[in-house]
Amino acid sequence: MRSSFLAFLLRKKPAPAGNVADNTRVRTKPTSVVIRQFWLLTFSIFLSTVWLLPNHYLPWSTFHMDAWAALLLCGMSLAVILRSPSVASWNSMTLMALTLACLPATQFVSGSITFAGIAWINSSYLLGFLLALHIGNRWESATPRQLADALFLAIGIASIASVGLQLYQWFRLDGIDIWSMGQGQGRPYANFGQPNQLATFLLWGLVATCWAAKRAYIGPGTAIFVAAYLLLGLAMSASRTAWLALGFFTVMSWVWRRHCSAKYMPWLVMGLGIYFVACTALLGELGELVKLPAVDPFDPSRMVAGARAQIWSMLLEAALERPFWGYGWGQVVEAQLLNGLNYPSLYSVYAQSHNLFLDLALWNGIPVALGIFIIVAHWLYKKVSAINSAESVLLLLFVLVPLNHAMLELPLHHAYVLLPVGLVMGAMDSAENNQSIFKARRGILLAILLLAFVMLVTIIRDYSRIERSYLQLRFNQVNPAAFAPPDVPDVVMLSQWREFMRLINFEPQPNISDQQIEWMRRLTLLYPSAGFSQKLATGLAFQGKKSEAQVWLKRACNVNTASQCEALQNAWSRQSKQNQWVAQVPWPE
């Protein structure tokens, strides 16, 4: 009789197994048990909640998901470091991650990054990725397959629950509103806040289902049923990225069919693909029949690149203007503002380019981006060349799913995607310990973990204060007479949001200094709202810099909505009647 996934995790002795990432040798048993089964199950359950949290609020909409994922990684990292062999292997991927983690600080010192908080946030994510690579490597080396079992169980739980939330949202039910965010407006997204993010996660759920079936934790019938259920959710997301991924899955099922124990697997994958297409086609008809919202996935307007072509063209030009050093981590908005007037208005701010490689070029310059591309491409080439089992195929697909998405959007900008990818990449590298560039004692990893934990706790502490101030701001904007302006939060790391709140409360005066102008300019390059642009343009008008004031008004209309631009124009007109300096700056044509 087939044992269940939960039964496996609660067994007292792990099943003998070879290392899933080891393609040169087979182990008859694990060298040690890193995490005991009860705690492994507990970890999986807690990890599954990362992707189910409904808290998505400005100014950092994914903060709670990312922070919870990072806290769980820190806790598990300590256990793995202390309970696994003492030597830590450093390879090209971990050295690249370490180098990247240091870059934001270097860019802040050199002036490329304008606020220390931007450097702190980006370094913390990169440090988390570095830690995940090491932990995945050590965990897989010590207890093969245990990491993948725990991770895929967590993903399986969360993906099944997420499709349930999608159905809840699509049918417009009520009763669990505090556990569900929004209705999805025709594209239910569970608690991810964005349909394409959910689609990538459901693709992970399909990989997890295949893993459970391959490891005989569930039977073939159960696996097919779960896959069909997840594909229904994937169809409801109406994600075009998912179509690319499923097409790739289908092709690869034939390319790697020799690694499948069931010879009918490619045909089964094709059948499930046809089922997905049918679900996609029927959902629109069903929604119209029962008066439920639905997005037509075959709408020609959704089958084109939309604004992406213009975004990529504009930001590629921006990257070529600073080819060697870039704009600094997290500074894509600056690139958009400085180059956007050469292109038609996008009426939106883009903090990312929607292409990982272009982001890397904008952040670090083209040479660094090319270096990262070469290292990652070489890593992928080695993993593809070394495939010799269904398990290694599934782990590679796990990494390729978000990489595919990252060419069109930004899944790897979130810790709840980046950290699991790092864990699996590290696990896949565990077979190459003997090919590492150098080895060091685990004290270095403990130091990295301590630094990451201190940064994480400080960021959580800072953001809790920022969140309170932002809530005050929202109340004040709704009813200024009843609610006071927001307090300026006392923070240690997240200085950019402290300055954001300061500028909210700041009003330019005729005697404004050059330092104050530069401070407003730096903040507006990060947060180019209509209000901040108006304040900066007013300050420039006080200094007689009429042309620059007009440029900033143009930039504001280029990246804000048409209604916001109209409101800014009306506000500037009213201000001109009351202020002689502003009156000398006509609204730009």
Annotate the PLM regions.
Residues 1-121, 125-153, 212-221, 435-515, ...:
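Transmembrane signal-anchor hairpin modules in multi-pass inner-membrane enzymes, especially those
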Residues 9, 41-53, 70-79, 105-108, ...:
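Alpha-helical transmembrane segments of multi-pass inner-membrane proteins
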Residues 57, 114-123, 184-198, 300-306, ...:
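Short aromatic-rich membrane-water interface segments that cap or initiate transmembrane helices
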Residues 58-63, 117-118, 192-196, 238-241, ...:
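Membrane-interface catalytic loops of GT-C/OST-like multi-pass glycosylation enzymes that act
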Residues 71-73, 250, 390-444:
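Transmembrane alpha-helices of multi-pass inner-membrane enzymes
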Residues 150-161, 261-284, 448:
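Hydrophobic alpha-helical membrane-interfacial segments at the cytosolic entry of transmembrane helices
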Residues 188, 249, 276-312, 465-478:
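Flexible juxtamembrane loops connecting transmembrane helices in multi-pass membrane enzymes
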Residues 194, 309-350, 357, 364-368:
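TM-adjacent membrane-interface loops and short helices in multi-pass inner/ER membrane proteins
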